[in-house]
Amino acid sequence: MSALSPIPLRRLDPGIPVPTRAHPGDAGVDLCTTEDVVLAPGERVLVGTGIAVALPVGTVGLIHPRSGLAAKTGLSVVNTPGTVDAGYRGEIKVCLINHDPRTPIELRRGDRIAQLLVQRVELVDFVEVEQLDETSRGAGGHGSSGGHASLTPGARSAARVAQEG
């Protein structure tokens, strides 16, 4: 797979740094907020990043939360991952949410708030059919593969008994 050419980036706010990687080899580049924001517990807000990009056709920009902020403060991205389509040329904005039940989150202009990853994507077409081929999974979804003790009926009953006891 060949490397992508450098991506054209327009800085809409000269006071905000161009996105960079925290460490060589990191997958994502850090995005910063252009404004001071205080998010109350449970509140969400759409913030600008001060940049616009020209992604090549066949790629997508994915906006992910910064893991340290999520773990330490509860700050996350509402529609994780956010999607930046190749044809979009406007300012990249990030819809943030404060998941902490008690503590407001204070962000200052220039704070790193999210990560942007650029990935190749398959541009597929769909064809309508009357029936899909059979698989061992079938229509099983939303927890059908198990893997978590609290999802088994016996474990749920035992947990209720332990709480009531």
UniProtKB/Swiss-Prot annotation:
It is an enzyme of class 3 (hydrolase). GO terms for biological process: dUMP biosynthetic process; dUTP catabolic process. Keywords: Hydrolase, Magnesium, Metal-binding, Nucleotide metabolism. The keyword Magnesium applies. InterPro entries: dUTPase, dUTPase-like, dUTPase-like_sf, dUTPase_trimeric. GO terms for molecular function: dUTP diphosphatase activity; magnesium ion binding. Its cofactor is Mg(2+). It catalyses: dUTP + H2O = dUMP + diphosphate + H(+). Its EC number is 3.6.1.23. Residues 134-165 are annotated as: Disordered. Gene3D superfamilies: 2.70.40.10. Disulfide bonds: none annotated. It comes from the Bacteria. Pfam families: dUTPase. Substrate binds at R66, S67, G68, N79, T83, V84, D85, K93. Pathway: Pyrimidine metabolism; dUMP biosynthesis; dUMP from dCTP (dUTP route): step 2/2. This enzyme is involved in nucleotide metabolism: it produces dUMP, the immediate precursor of thymidine nucleotides and it decreases the intracellular concentration of dUTP so that uracil cannot be incorporated into DNA. Belongs to the dUTPase family. This is Deoxyuridine 5'-triphosphate nucleotidohydrolase. It comes from Nocardia farcinica (strain IFM 10152). The gene is dut.
